[in-house]
Amino acid sequence: MSTGTVVQVIGAVVDVEFPHDAVPQVYDALEIKSEGLVLEVQQQLGGGVVRTIAMGSSDGLRRGLEVVNSGSPITVPVGEKTLGRIMNVLGEPVDEAGPIGEEDRYVIHREAPSYEDQSSSTELLETGIKVIDLVCPFAKGGKVGLFGGAGVGKTVNMMELINNIAKAHSGLSVFAGVGERTREGNDFYYEMEDSGVLDKVAMVYGQMNEPPGNRLRVALTGLTMAEKFRDEGKDVLFFVDNIYRYTLAGTEVSALLGRMPSAVGYQPTLAEEMGVLQERITSTKTGSITSVQAVYVPADDLTDPSPATTFAHLDATVVLSRNIASLGIYPAVDPLDSTSRQLDPQVVGQEHYDVATGVQTQLQRYKELKDIIAILGMDELSDDDKTTVFRARKIEKYLSQPFFVAEVFTGSPGKYVSLKDTIRGFKGILDGEFDHLPEQAFYMVGSIDEAVEKANKK
C-alpha cells in the first residue's frame, strides 16, 4: 500500500502525488484517513500525479494531507447480509443498525458476462397494472424503462411495480437511488417496511445533494449487489431511480476533468458510460436480473441524448405522458408510445396480441378524429366513427387504475388486475359488450366486473 500527498483541490477534483514507482491505477480507491474520505482515480497526469474524484464532500481538504492507496477499486458488501439495510456508495450502512457483517465483498468495476454465459427469456412477468400488462408486457430477466418528464409519476409507478412484483414474485430486490430526493428514499424504506418485504430488499442511496463522483458510482454499487444474488442462482429485481441522474453525474465529472462536451453539453463518453452499466444488467444461465429503470426526460423531449441513449438498451419502454396526466388518468402511461419486444403473438399468444393492437388502433383513430370533432362536432362523424370514439373514450378511462402506494393520497383502495382479467375487459369493450354503460363507470376501477357494478349502482 503506497502513500501519497494531496497537491491540489478544486471542488470534487483532488490531485494526489505518489512516488514514481508506486502510481495507482485508474479506478483504484484512495483513502484520506484523517478525513475519512475515499477518492477514485480517474486520470494519470504524469510525474507521479493522479487526478481523482471525491466520493464525499471535499470541504476542509488541504494540500499536504496523506493519502493511502488501497490497491484495488472500491469494494462493497454483497450477499444475504445486505438485505433490509440502507447503504451508501461505499457499502457503508447509513441506517444506524450496526455493521453489515458481510461474508464477502466485490469490486464495483466488473466485466459484463460473456456472450456464451448470457441467457434470454420470454417468460412474462405479470405486474397487475392493466396498461403495462396489455400494451408493454415485461419479460422475466428483461430491462424496462419508465420514461417521463417532471411530475408525471415515474417514482409512484416504480413504487407500485416494486409493491406488486416484490410481493407476488417473493424474490430478492435491490434498489439503487441515484441522485434522487432523500424524502423519496425515506418514503421507500417505510413503504417496504409496511408491506413486510423489507427483509428481501437491499437499498443503496446516493442522493442529489451528494458530490457527482458519488452519484456516478452508486448505480454500480447497487448493480454489484444484484450480480452477487444472480451468480448464486437467484432471480433478482434491480430498480434504478433515476438513470438520468447517473448520466448527469457523468456530465459533471466529465466537465470537472476538463473533457470537451458533446451535444447539449453531455460528456463525450455518454454512450460508452451507459453501455458499461447496461451491459452488466443481464441474465445468465445461473440466475436472472430483471431491471426497472426510471428515466427522467428533460423538457419532455424524448430525443434528448440521455433518454435517447437509454432507449437502445431496453426490452420494454413505458412512456408517461403529461397530456394523459392532465386528463386525470393515472397511471399516465401513453399506450401509443409505449413498446415492448414481448408484444408478439408467439410470446404473448394471439388473443393478447389482437386485443392490444385493437386497443391501440381504436385510440389512434380517436386521436385522428379529435381535430374533426373540435372543428365540426360529433354530429358530422359517420356512425362507425362515433362508435370508435365512444369505445376509445371507455378504453382511455379503463386504462386508469387505483394504486396501492397511492391509497393515502386518493382514498381509493389499490387494485391488482390479473392478465386474464385485463384481456377479458378490453376485449369486451372492443367487441361492444359494454356499449350501454356510461364511460365514467370505467374510470379508476380494477377489473371490468367493478366497472359494471359501478354503472349498476348509478
Swiss-Prot record:
Its main location: membrane. It is an enzyme of class 7 (translocase). It comes from the Bacteria. Disulfide bonds: none annotated. GO terms for molecular function: ATP binding; ATP hydrolysis activity; proton-transporting ATP synthase activity, rotational mechanism. Its EC number is 7.1.2.2. It is found in: Cell inner membrane. Transmembrane segments: none annotated. It catalyses: ATP + H2O + 4 H(+)(in) = ADP + phosphate + 5 H(+)(out). GO terms for cellular component: plasma membrane; proton-transporting ATP synthase complex. Keywords: ATP synthesis, ATP-binding, Cell inner membrane, Cell membrane, CF(1), Hydrogen ion transport, Ion transport, Membrane, Nucleotide-binding, Translocase, Transport. It is a peripheral membrane protein. HAMAP family: ATP_synth_beta_bact. Belongs to the ATPase alpha/beta chains family. This is ATP synthase subunit beta. The lineage of its organism: Bacteria, Pseudomonadati, Pseudomonadota, Gammaproteobacteria, Alteromonadales. The gene is atpD.
